[in-house]
């Protein structure tokens, strides 16, 4: 009796499924890295806007705006981000959930300089910007 075997064996199908799984995993990792980088760049852009807002605030009020009135670092949260939007960014909605970062501002011991801190919501990445607009990562391995 002559039987024609058409189709794929179970092993061939398993190999194809395994290859598709590997490709999907690589794609998901690349995509989430892309999204993370985009959010970090958005935070950097908003920090530059805050710096411009600080310049305008200084020219109008004779001092910088601080979400943390004491010297030392601040802890970014929703309240500090909303306060920055109200006082420095013209009530814009620049610091939103899609950006994935919260911001705050604090002063140094001389009260003549400011720093902007951006912290990733639910993450470890912390960006720091000084009054000259230089942005650095607090711990590069976390970003």
Task: Tell where the protein language model's regions lie, with residue ranges.
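N-terminal single-pass transmembrane signal-anchor helix
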Residues: 1-31
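Surface-exposed loop/turn and secondary-structure junction residues enriched for glycine/proline
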Residues: 4, 31, 38, 55, ...
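Acidic/proline-rich low-complexity IDRs
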Residues: 9-13, 19, 51, 87-88, ...
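Aliphatic-rich helix starts adjacent to a transmembrane/signal segment
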Residues: 21, 28-47
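N-terminal alpha-helical signal peptides/signal-anchor transmembrane segments
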Residues: 34, 46-62
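Periplasmic/extracellular, small/polar-rich flexible segments of pilin-like filament-forming proteins
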Residues: 59-143
């Amino acid at each position: 009796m002559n039987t024609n075997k058409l189709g794929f064996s179970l092993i061939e199908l398993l190999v194809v499924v395994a290859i598709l799984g590997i490709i999907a995993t690589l794609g998901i990792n690349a995509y989430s890295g892309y999204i993370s980088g985009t959010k970090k760049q958005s935070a950097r852009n908003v920090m530059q806007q805050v710096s411009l807002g600080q310049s305008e605030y200084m020219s109008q009020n004779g001092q910088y705006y601080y979400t943390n009135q004491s010297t030392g670092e601040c802890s970014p949260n929703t309240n500090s981000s909303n306060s920055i939007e109200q006082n420095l960014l013209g009530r814009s909605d620049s610091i939103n959930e899609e950006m994935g970062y919260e911001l705050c501002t604090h002063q140094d011991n001389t009260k003549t300089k400011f720093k902007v801190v951006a912290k990733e919501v639910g993450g470890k990445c912390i960006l720091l910007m000084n009054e000259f607009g230089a942005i650095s990562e607090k711990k590069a391995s976390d970003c």
